[in-house]
C-alpha cells in the first residue's frame, strides 16, 4: 500500500484489492462462476452477490463499511471535490474503527491507529479473507503425490 501521504492512491488500491476478494468469495460460493461476467460487474453488485453467498458470519458492519468504501472511492473517481472525498474517507475510518472487532481489541477507545486508512483497509481485507474462506488450505503437493503411490512392503 502507498504511504499515508497519498491517501487517494491508497483508497483506489485498497478498493481494487477488496474488489478482488469479493470476486473470490463469489467464485467460491457459486456452483458455476464461469457464467458470471465479473469484468462487467460493478463493486456494489459484487458486494451484494458476495454477501448472498458469504459462508462466514454476516454482521452488518462489514457490508456497511464496504458500501462506505465504495462511496468514498466514487467521490474520488467521479468528482473534483477533495473536501467531499476527505469527508467520505473520514466517515469510513470512523465507522470501521467503531465496529471492527480487531480495532476494538488492539486500540484503546478513541485511539487512532498510525495509518488509519491503511489500517481499516487491512481490517476489511482480512475479515473478508478469513470469514469468506477465500484462501482454502492447499494440500501439500508432495504429500498428495506420495499418497497416490502404491504401498510398498519392505
What are these regions (language model features)?
Residues 1-154:
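Amphipathic alpha-helical interface elements
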Amino acid at each position: 500500500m502507498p504511504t499515508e501521504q497519498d491517501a487517494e492512491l491508497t483508497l483506489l488500491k485498497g478498493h481494487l484489492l477488496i474488489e478482488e476478494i469479493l470476486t473470490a468469495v463469489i467464485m467460491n460460493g457459486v456452483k458455476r462462476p464461469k457464467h458470471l461476467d465479473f469484468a462487467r460487474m460493478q463493486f456494489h453488485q459484487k458486494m451484494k452477490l458476495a454477501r448472498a453467498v458469504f459462508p462466514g458470519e454476516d454482521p452488518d458492519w462489514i457490508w456497511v463499511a464496504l458500501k462506505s468504501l465504495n462511496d468514498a472511492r466514487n467521490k474520488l473517481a467521479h468528482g473534483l471535490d477533495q473536501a467531499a472525498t476527505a469527508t467520505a474517507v473520514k466517515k469510513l475510518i470512523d465507522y470501521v474503527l467503531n465496529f471492527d472487532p480487531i480495532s476494538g481489541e488492539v486500540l484503546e477507545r478513541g485511539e487512532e491507529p498510525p495509518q488509519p486508512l491503511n489500517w481499516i483497509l487491512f481490517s476489511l481485507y482480512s475479515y473478508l479473507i478469513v470469514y469468506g474462506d477465500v484462501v482454502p488450505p492447499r494440500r501439500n503437493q508432495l504429500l498428495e503425490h506420495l499418497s497416490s503411490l502404491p504401498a510398498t512392503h519392505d
